Amino acid sequence: MLVKTSKLLGALFIVVASILSACSKSDNSANNKQSKTANTSSENAIIKIDGSSTVYTITETVAEEFQLATKVNVTVGISGTGGGFKKFCRGETDIQNASRPILEKEMVACKRAGIEYIELPIAYDSLTVVVNQRNNFLSSITVEELKKMWEPAAQGVIKTWAQVNPAWPNTPLKLFGAGSDSGTFNYFTKAIVGKAKSSRGDFTTSEDDNGLVQGVQSDKGGLAYFGYAYYVENQARLKVVPIVAVAG
């Protein structure tokens, strides 16, 4: 029985490979014909991965190396942590990338579907707030200022930078962030607004952080948050904003 997992670790692929190898050995003990069939099956095998965009960069790197070393194909999708768990608990994927632990309701869904899994923490990441490179007035930002931008009460009301801080220009504020199925969205809203999933809804969303990068890069008044790894990959095109306790 293939044991599924909720997070990806380099060693995880070794576990999966060992299971496939064990099947081949079993077939070899039966007869050569069955062994040949098993090997052909391994060559055509596909490991399906989905979930968090934050974990995507690590997963994609390991997947590429794994495919070079084996004949097993690996597909890596980005549906967000929540969206990925829905697929995982329906048995549509083999590995679930997550930027948070599995929720109780997701445990129940997996149990009902007969999905067994192991959870493997692989890394710690931090969220990064970025703006357009042409933004020449923002050297830092406070949690309160971010809250004023992102809280539900800001929807349809806070439309310019000056409305957040009078010292800032009257430039249109364009926000980019993770979708509601994302673990990143849950974490950011809880840390900044004070309650998970509590956010204005009139901003551009994407489960793929590359889309957020492109959005901020193309809009002078843009601001976004996403995993630090995506900032590192795109730091030549973006400006990172330190979060401070007091404005100044």
Task: Give the ranges of each region predicted by the language model.
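Bacterial N-terminal signal peptides that target proteins for export
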Residues: 1-10
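Flexible loop/hinge segments at secondary-structure junctions
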Residues: 23-248
